[in-house]
Structures are given as C-alpha cells and as structure tokens.
Amino acid sequence: MTAALAVSTAACGGSSDTSNQPSVNTDVTFESGTTMATLKSAGKVKIGTKFDQPLFGLKGLDGKPTGFDVEVAKLIAAKLGLAADKIEWVEAPSKVREEVIEQGKVDFVVATYTINDKRKERISFAGPYYEAGQDLMVKSDDSAITGPEALKAANAKVCSVTGSTPAEKIKEYADPANIVLFDVYSKCADALRTGQVQAVTTDNVILLGLVDGSKGDFKLVGKPFTKEPYGIGIKKGDTKFCEFINKTLTDAVADGSYDKAWKDTAGKVSPEAPKLPALGTCS
C-alpha cells in the first residue's frame, strides 16, 4: 500500500514568484514538546496531499503540486515559520491517508479529506476548512443521468475511488455490480472517456476540476446530494496541533489569505470564494 506513495520535494505553487507565497512567521516560538515546536526546530515539514486533483492538489510537469489544498497547507507551514521550500510533499491517495498519518510518513494531510466518525477512530481532524458536496460527472452529451436516482434506471456503471466517502455513499443509489473503484480519480475520468463507466462520483469541487480539464468532454450533473466537510488530518489526540491549525484558518480568513488561496486556484473556475465552515472541537 505504501508503494503507492510518491514524494515531491519541490515547493508548491504555479510560479516561483515569492510574492505568491504566504508570509512566513519567522519570529514564532512554541511550547516545548508540541508538534509545532518539533516541526519549527526541524526546519521542515512533510505534508500529504493529492497529486491528481485539478484545482485542489495536482502535480504539474515541473514536479510542483498546485491547488487550494496545497495553498491551505502552505498557510499552515508559514505559521509554523516554514517557507514553501521547506515542505516535502507526499502523495496521499484516499486509501492511504490514515496510514501515512499513523505511520508518521507525514506530519499532516490536506487532501480533500472528508471528516467522518470512522476516520476519527484512527486519526484526528482540524478544521473543516471547506465544505463540498457529492455530485456526478458524465459525458457532455449524456441526458439520461440527471442525478443519483437515475443511475439504476439507466443501468449505469459509476466510478469512484477506493476508501473514499463518495464510494460508500453511492451504494445507496447504484447496484453494487455497477460500482467500479480505482485508486485515483484520474483513472475514473479515463474510464468515463472510454465508455467503461457512464458516470464518476466524488465531491463536486473535485469533479469541477476534472470537467475543467476535459476540453468539453465532460459535464457536472449539478445536483449535489451530500455535505462533505474537508478537514486536515493529524495524529489522533494531538489537541494542541489541532487548535493551532484552527487558529491559523481563522487568522487566514481575517487577513485575506484564505480568500487569496481560493482565488489563485479553484477560484479560476468557481470565482466566488467559500466561507470558512464552523470549526470542530479539538479533542
């Protein structure tokens, strides 16, 4: 399972222009023994994210991951006193996110990571920093699939990713034999393009990125049927790190860097910046 991981030590962002980087908190000090103090002292941080999610976490030809998740992660690193070039990016596909946190392969994960009770049995979450909703993506000329209720009537095969919340939820709407699972959403998009499946399901913002990159081949059905709060995955019980991240998020809203992170990434397709959801309790 860990063989699926890939690592990029490149700094993130679509440009090497340092004006696009968040302001680094160089004078910060932390309580001894906390995760924050450990990372500041080490002078580097390992962050898990997606490498195949347009607009949220996508590794470019230059080896640099870009997207909203990447920018949120950079904001946290900056508050730790670490510039973007001190980040080691670790690919964290859906099925290994808990594993890489538990095994210490990353210090935290920002990877379209829905907060739910099952995952909380293994790890803790800071945030949420964004709320998405599950939707469907189909071919642009498809008029039969108008929402999740239409999947059975159309006898449609639908694709999602192993270990993801959407893969579980779609079982309520599609016959089990018609659910196809891969390890990354880009393979689902390929399956839709070749006709192996008739729909792809995950959170609407992820699908929006796939639609944007499809050159008109795909469309979003546009009928979200869940609420998916995205959290930042950390080691279970690390309350102080959770509180630090939550304060970083509220500070980012106050100083405008949260809105900027959106506008520089997903906002290029969906211009209206989201509101920060109500933050969960750290415990």
Regions inferred by a protein language model and the residue ranges of each:
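Extracytoplasmic small-molecule ligand-binding "clamshell" domains
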Residues: 25-109
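Periplasmic-binding protein-like
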Residues: 131-138, 208-247, 269-283
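A ligand-binding cleft/hinge motif common to bilobed small-molecule-binding domains
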Residues: 113-121, 169-172, 193-227
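Bilobed "Venus flytrap"/periplasmic-binding protein-like clamshell domains
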Residues: 65-80, 114, 132-187, 204-208, ...
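Acidic, polar ligand-binding/catalytic clefts
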Residues: 87-150
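Bacterial signal peptide processing site
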Residues: 13-16
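Alpha-to-beta junction loops
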Residues: 45-46, 82-85, 103-111, 156-157, ...
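C-terminal motif of bacterial Sec signal peptides marking the signal peptidase cleavage site
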Residues: 7-11
